[in-house]
């Protein structure tokens, strides 16, 4: 029987190469007495013939395949059916046959890797095909499936293998569909407990899903359930995008804010938050101020380090340079406030190496702003004439004042 069928298939293949008439194939595939093995042989012949423009055939065949799915009873039937589903989905994907999206999704459900008897190939092929046929209506379904995988804790190696096949299919689909709703679940694959190769696939896909995932990035950074390492990764991923500067500035503001509002005693997490703050401060210098809340958080990056016994001088320098580069009345006012505080310390103490270093940096920053603020000029004049300062410190203040006055 199989030999006769194969001869018929080869004959039909030769006909189809020249005519592209798939009627005979369709009739043979839909024989009511056909087996899953026989249908698989026919599909393999179609695939190997390299025919094109046959999306309608694949679609009709898939519809019939779904109708006959309840007939799957044995392991042999299931293996042949899964291989057939792969060929059908790959064919529809290659043809970009959008009308078949609904049936392709049924294959996702029919061969869900949650079933122990399913290998994972068919589900992966179906998910990939959904991206290829531009199945926009199914973005929420794919994103939800991927989110569900992200929340699972899987210890069985075989189950893990099958799930990761479906995860790769989901990533591929969401990358192809370019919808922001796919960004969050793919991001959480990149920071999840999957194999490194799977996480890398997700990370590589992220910049291709949407140009500007700013809103989603802010949600992840502000999410109280996201640990600092995840927040830091979300921030760094935002920097890799093609988002406009205004969007990156908004996310930078959120990253800086969360870097100060998230409380933890975990040293690793505190390092994550510090790195996120410093990256955000650099970005604000580059992309600008998105809202006035940034000023208060920049001030925190200076003041909290100022009172710390082990200050992060790198964060202080980045903050001062950013305030100088922004050069708005608000940023100059903050620099002026810093100098006022240092002036108070010079009079009343303590005044040690830390204060001397900060004094030098703040005076230099005010000089570089070119500000014409009367308050700044008066304070610099006072410092230049106060004996409690060293001659070097008074000279620094005088030089800054002369620069602002345009005399040097």
Language model: regions and residue ranges:
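Amphipathic alpha-helical scaffolding segments comprising HEAT/armadillo-like alpha-solenoid repeats
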Residues: 20-30, 51-73, 95-113, 135-156, ...
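Sec/Tat signal peptide C-region and signal peptidase I cleavage site
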Residues: 13-19
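Structural detector for internal amphipathic alpha-helices that build alpha-solenoid repeat scaffolds
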Residues: 36-53, 73-98, 119-136, 155-179, ...
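N-terminal alpha-helical scaffolding segments that mark the starts
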Residues: 32-34
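Sec-dependent N-terminal signal peptides
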Residues: 4-13
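Short coil/turn segments at helix-helix junctions and helix-capping linkers
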Residues: 193-194, 388-389
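Alpha-solenoid helical-repeat scaffold
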Residues: 377-382, 389-395
């Amino acid at each position: 029987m199989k030999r006769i069928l194969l001869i018929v298939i080869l004959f039909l293949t030769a006909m189809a190469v020249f005519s592209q008439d798939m009627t005979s194939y369709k009739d043979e595939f839909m024989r009511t007495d056909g087996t899953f093995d026989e249908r698989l042989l026919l599909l393999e012949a179609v695939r190997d013939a390299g025919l094109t423009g046959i999306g309608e055939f694949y679609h009709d065949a898939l519809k019939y395949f779904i109708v006959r799915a309840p007939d799957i009873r044995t392991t042999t039937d299931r293996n042949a059916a899964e291989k057939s589903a792969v060929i059908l989905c790959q064919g529809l994907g290659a043809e970009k046959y959008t009308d078949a999206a609904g049936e392709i999704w049924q294959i996702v459900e029919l061969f869900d890797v949650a079933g122990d008897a399913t290998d994972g190939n068919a589900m992966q092929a179906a998910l990939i095909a959904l991206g290829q046929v531009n199945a926009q209506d199914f973005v929420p379904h794919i994103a939800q499936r991927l989110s569900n995988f992200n929340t699972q804790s899987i210890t069985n190696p075989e189950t893990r293998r099958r799930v990761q096949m479906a995860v790769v299919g989901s990533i591929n689909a969401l990358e192809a569909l370019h919808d922001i709703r796919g960004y969050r679940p793919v991001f959480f694959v990149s920071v999840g407990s999957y194999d490194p190769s799977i996480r890398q696939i997700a990370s590589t896909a992220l910049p291709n899903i949407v140009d500007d995932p700013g809103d989603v990035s802010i949600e992840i950074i502000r999410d109280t359930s996201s640990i600092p390492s995840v927040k830091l990764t979300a921030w760094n991923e935002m920097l890799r995008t093609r988002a406009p500067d205004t969007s990156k500035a908004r996310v930078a503001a959120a990253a800086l804010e969360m870097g100060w509002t998230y409380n933890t005693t975990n040293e690793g997490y505190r390092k994550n938050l510090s790195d996120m703050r410093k990256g955000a401060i650099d970005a604000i210098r580059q992309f600008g101020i998105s809202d006035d809340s940034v000023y208060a958080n920049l001030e925190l990056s200076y003041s909290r380090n100022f009172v710390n016994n082990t200050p992060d001088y790198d964060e202080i320098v980045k903050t001062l340079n950013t305030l100088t580069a922004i050069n708005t009345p608000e940023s100059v006012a903050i620099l002026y406030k810093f100098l006022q505080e240092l002036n108070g310390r010079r009079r009343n103490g303590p005044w040690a190496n830390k204060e001397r270093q900060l004094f030098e940096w703040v005076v230099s920053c005010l000089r570089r702003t070119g500000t014409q603020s009367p308050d700044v000029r008066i304070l610099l004049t006072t410092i230049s004439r106060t004996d409690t300062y060293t001659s070097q410190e008074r000279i620094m203040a005088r030089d800054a004042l002369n620069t602002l006055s345009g005399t040097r």
